[in-house]
Amino acid sequence: MANLRTNFLGVEIKNPVGVTSCDFGGNTRLAKRVIDKGIGWLVGKTVHKIDGPHRWPRPYFYSLKKFGPELRDSWTCSQMFHNMPYEQWLETEGPATLKLCRENDCLFIPSVSGIGTDPDTWIPFCKDMENMGCDMIELDTGGPHATFGAVAAHKDVGAPLAMDPDTAYKVTKACVDAVKIPIIFKMTPQCVNMAALALAVERAGAAGISANNAFYGTWIDHETASFYGGPFSCGGLMGRAWQLFSLAKVLEITATVKIPVIGIGGIFTWDDCVRYMMGGCHVTGLCSALYSRGVGVLKDVIDGISAFMDRKGYKSVDEFIGVCVPEFSYIRDWPKEEAPMKYPSPIIPVFDLEKCNNCGICEKLCPYGAVEIHKNKGPIINEHCMGCAWCQGHCPKDAVTMILKETGETIWNGRGLPSKWCK
């Protein structure tokens, strides 16, 4: 039986699956809904004193599902930080949520936001969390809304802080020096140089990093010739497809620094969690999936990881955390054939006719017009084949293998990495 217990910043947790900062960490009623599913950790809804308690522009969730099946899990969102006055939260929901989590073997991580780049506005929150008895604190510096504050003094609140290494260092260092519990810095995917930012907060003494917050986005309703939901950029690109971008950003961090990382962004399934952990994350968190698929997805994810570990023979999650990080590199470093590229391609697809059902998808989708379906011979490639593997990726029967034409050597079977056939 797989052991999902792991250690995160000195705290042993029952499994690496948690819920990131959202409604479900905002009060005990909602927190109980996800805690009851067996999560190992929970981040609170971000508390703050920016312009007083936030008033979310109701309605504030704008699902894009009606615009096509490709967008079934995507939405934009103008919900902001916690809408409860900070002092009220500090006296009621904060301590109550911490107590609820501890009673259920669930790590509670409060999330706080000061005002922009002024460290003095962050320190009081950190001291309050420490006095409350919290084990660690998340600095939510990566909010996707362009500007939270309504006045000029607040123009750098949110993502701008998490895009500048010098400013991030200054705020992180001040918070680290102010308390004795670990500080976690939350990143924004808007940051161009994640490695530089990660190095800055590690140097400042951050114990961990959360990556990534949501990106920003907007949508136009073509039927009404107007914006959909709101005429502004707000939290967007939520959904599983977002994972491709976020995971790449995460790897820029895990390949650069040694401090633990909370993996966030487009996680919907158990294998998404495994993917982030193999990419170097110590724990992984869900958010959007709870809204578009329901809180029951959490138990499915936890059970799925356990079953995967049993199937693969992993005894502990530590055995596969970071296994892909050493391989992460730049495309410029991948072996390539000598210029110019050979034509016709030395790499071609071969089709397993016992699996092929002549569906014609490869012929239809080949961008080079290089595949022709013959009734009795199956797919036949012509001289225009570029060896791109597009047909392989779209074959519903897994009937395509990429080979080196000259020798018949298998170059890629559609799983993992292709062979480095260029010497």
Regions found by a protein language model. Give the residues of each.
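Short pre-active-site segment immediately N-terminal to redox-active cysteine/selenocysteine motifs
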Residues: 354-355, 365, 384, 394
